[in-house]
């Protein structure tokens, strides 16, 4: 396509976004079908340069203002906090040992020109895990979930990898808890957290706010 946007894979992006919103709509079989159409080796990114800079880096990472990483829990309650050694924590956060705040934003927001994924390929795997769990296909759900939990950074197009031992969750509730936990970690700062909290019925006490306070 002559006027293609640099960094954008149109077909995979359309199928990925279709899968996302079918899941949100409770259309689980259709969500699985759409997710299966996405090539997990391909990437789509919003690209930035010295003139058009990464907006999160410019407004938050570089200023430690607006919002900021607080600690290594990534906003999760203790029962769902990242497992020790989860490689995604080091991907999404960095540590400043000399100047407060100690925890800093990293990942896709660590420089003015860092590209931001339109979607992460692993989101498709988590969509399938959730959809299978919500339709009581627990074996398939656990298989998809463990693809994300055991994935190494080198096996991921964006170098996001937990590299942990597989989950042994055996009930729908336990698997869905693991799906929620891993969505929060794997897709950190992707803008999907509030929708996920609502869909998974998380307590409102876990939220800092329901809406960002724009006038």
Residue ranges and their predicted role:
Residues 1-74, 78-215:
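Acidic/polar-rich alpha-helix caps and helix-coil junctions
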